[in-house]
Regions:
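Solvent-exposed, conformationally flexible loop/turn segments
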Residues: 500-514, 546-548, 564-572, 609-613, ...
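Short acidic, flexible loop segments centered on an aromatic residue
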Residues: 589-598, 618
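Secondary-structure capping and domain/repeat boundary segments
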Residues: 484-559
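Asparagine-centered strand-capping/turn motif at beta-strand->loop junctions
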Residues: 579-583, 608
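Serine/threonine-rich, repeat-prone extracellular segments and beta-strand-based repeat modules
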Residues: 464-480, 531-552, 626, 633-637
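N-terminal capping/linker segments that flank leucine-rich repeat
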Residues: 2-132, 146-161, 179-183, 413-417, ...
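Structural signature of tandem-repeat unit edges
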Residues: 70-78, 92-104, 117-134, 143-162, ...
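Structural beta-strand segments of beta-rich domains
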Residues: 71, 571-575
Length: 645
């Protein structure tokens, strides 16, 4: 069912019109039977032997069916729009009216209404001249009518019919309607013409000439059983309002309005309200340049999977309230070109668009908007909303604006200001992990009461109140992330980093990777990061961050053995340096040289018999002692490169 509880009421012209005339108390059928003055006489001009004439006049005859006791009336000849007083005794009894081979003249407004013919069930107008009829306004406005046939009629002169407003309004029991014999070419007003034809399943208006019509407000409104409706040939070039035109046509599965000329239309509010059965609707050619009101235009079209409004000119629109409310099946909606500079209300605009996975409103001009309450309420598939360009300086209420956006992960509110009302603004945003908010937005009502942190300054908050208090003191837009951030403290253990710090602290979110930083220490070389100061558990930077930790730099002291020598090598010779470690320290062996003594064509490479990949200052270790020395030999081969160490 359609939830419209958050919509502000707007008149859709559903109220019943006032009575048009006062009638004297009319006797019932039982009273007629006991009134000797109106006893029926056998009918002479009928083929039905059960019918007897009870009263007649110049253009009418009233019958009673002796088999079932029902009263009926037949009209013919020149039929005026007035009702003779002779009918008064039968108005509460006549169930069927037939008008054949007649000429009708004047206004037949409210002619067959239920406050006149209180039990009327059927009306048939056939083979008659209707050129002189000026009005059928509310003519068949009756909850008792079940069948109306208007067909095979003549228009020897130009039709005079100007209004069919409420012509079949509130015909709750009407199951059969034929208007093929109605010439509507001169009609200007079709407001509510078929309003509340609640059980009517078929209606053929495919041949209607609507070229003169200026208003179609609520024309088919609340005709919830209509399964087919062909309006593809409607000429709507003169129409100024289509408000609620198809309001509540819940059973329509197809509706072709692709040829509608909407150049003059100013009001499209509720136009397709609750057309819940429509799976397709082509409005891509609509000219909406004159439209000012799009209140609830597509509200409740919950079967529409696609809706192309990308070419809508919305420069004149002042209200978009509930425009797409409850379009539950829509997965995409392109409103990126909407000109919203004149819009004052966007309340519930996308409420309950549960299928929308993405929505680009980044270009919306919201400088004139005063209400954004419920704007995205119930958009359960949206994961990100960029409202960074929204100007909310005129907004007074954002109540429940993002309520139950349960999939929303990121929200950008760069330019938001604090409105008068923001009750429940973030209620139900359970998946929200990132919020970038203006420093002028002072509260986050309904935000998850859990841990958050300032992503820039790495300040941790244990609950929502701490976050809000912190944000009140910010002087620039700030980004907040849900959860706990992790810290890695890197202790240089006597060494230093580039900026002379002895410690470095980096912060990451769980799952991210730590950055390895290398300190330096004079007289030592760096031998890695460890999780303990005994250097038994080496830290692995290839693993994602899962916990906060402190790591320690391991240093190895350098010892230098100086061997003064002048070295001259040819291609066949080599230099060997032997050393004996008589202690427990690691021995590094290097070669210092004067740049001018090394030929560019005969460079040397320092190699190690134990590890040929080690160059220069290659660490050599001995486990021996004076009684059990172990020699390590450093070999300089021809063609090797020596680097200073």
């Amino acid at each position: 069912s359609l939830d419209t509880s958050n919509l502000i009421a707007e008149e859709v012209a559903q109220d019943k019109p006032a009575e048009v005339e006062n009638l004297e108390e009319i006797p019932t059928t039982d009273e007629l039977m006991q009134n000797p003055d109106v006893r029926e006489q056998p009918v002479a001009d009928s083929d039905d032997s059960d019918l007897t004439v009870v009263s007649s006049g110049a253009y009418w005859t009233i019958y009673r069916n002796t088999a079932n006791g029902e009263y009926s009336m037949r009209m013919f000849g020149n039929v005026p729009s007035s009702r003779p007083t002779a009918w008064n005794s039968y108005l509460k009894s006549i169930k069927h009216i037939e008008i054949e081979e007649a000429t009708l003249t004047g206004s037949f407004a409210s002619y067959f209404r239920n406050n006149v013919f209180t039990v009327l069930e059927s009306v048939r107008i056939e083979r008659s001249n209707l050129s002189g009829v000026t009005s059928f306004e509310m003519a068949f406005y009756s909850p008792t009518l079940q069948k109306v046939i208007i067909r095979d009629n003549d228009y020897p002169t130009a039709p005079s019919l100007r209004t069919t407003e409420y012509m079949f309004g509130y015909t709750h029991k009407l199951t059969e309607l034929d208007v093929s014999g109605l010439d509507a070419s001169a009609v200007t007003n079709m407001n509510c013409m078929f309003n509340y034809c609640s059980v009517l399943e078929e209606l053929d208006v495919s041949n209607f000439d609507t070229s003169s019509v200026t208003t179609m407000r609520d024309m088919f409104g609340s005709s919830g059983k209509l399964e087919k409706l062909d309006v593809s040939n409607f000429d709507t070039s003169s129409v100024t309002t289509m408000q609620a035109m198809f309001y509540g046509c819940t059973s329509l599965e197809e509706l072709d309005v692709s040829n509608f000329d909407t150049n003059s239309v100013t009001n499209m509010s509720y136009m397709f309200y609750n057309c819940a059965g429509l799976e397709e609707l082509d409005v891509s050619n609509f000219d909406t340049s004159s439209v000012t009101n799009m209140y609830g235009t597509f509200v409740g079209c919950n079967s529409l999977e696609e809706l192309d409004v990308s070419n809508f000119d919305t420069s004149s629109v002042t209200t978009m309230q509930a425009m797409f409310n409850a379009c539950r099946a829509l997965e995409k909606l392109d409103v990126s070109n909407f000109d919203t500079s004149s819009v004052t209300t966007m309340q519930a605009m996308f409420e309950n668009c549960t299928g929308l996975g993405e929505l680009d409103v980044s270009n919306f001009d919201t400088s004139s908007v005063t209400t954004m309450a419920y704007m995205f309420d119930g958009c359960t598939s949206l994961e990100e909303l960029d409202l960074s360009n929204f100007d909310t300086s005129s907004v007074t209420t954002m109540a429940y604006m993002f309520q139950n956006c349960t999939a929303l992960k990121s929200l950008y509110l760069d330019n938001f200001t604090t409105p008068k009302t923001m009750t429940g603004m973030f209620t139900g945003t359970t998946a929200l992990t990132y919020l970038f908010a203006s420093h002028n937005l002072r509260a986050f009502d309904g935000l998850a009461n859990t841990r958050w942190y300032d992503e820039k300054n790495w300040v941790q908050f244990s609950n929502y109140k701490e976050l809000q208090m912190y944000h009140e003191y910010q002087r620039e837009p700030t980004g907040y992330r849900k959860g706990i951030f992790l810290s890695l403290t890197m202790d240089a253990m006597g060494g230093q980093f580039e900026e002379m710090e002895e410690q470095k602290v980096q912060n990451k979110v769980s799952g991210e990777y730590w950055e390895e930083m290398l300190p330096v220490k004079e007289g030592h070389y760096f031998d890695g990061w460890y999780l303990d100061q005994n250097f038994t558990n080496k830290f692995d930077f290839s693993l994602p961050a899962t916990v906060s930790a402190t790591i320690y730099a391991k240093w190895v002291e350098n010892y230098t053995v100086i061997i003064p020598a002048s070295i001259s090598l040819n291609e066949a010779s080599e230099l060997k340096v032997e050393g004996i470690n008589r202690g427990s320290k690691t021995l590094s062996v290097g070669l210092n040289y004067e740049e001018t003594t090394i030929s560019e064509s005969n460079k040397l490479t320092l190699s190690n018999t134990a590890d040929t990949t080690v160059q220069c200052l290659a660490p050599l270790s001995w486990d021996g002692s004076e009684t059990n020395p172990k020699n390590a030999i450093l070999t300089l081969a021809p063609g090797s490169e020596i680097t200073e160490g």
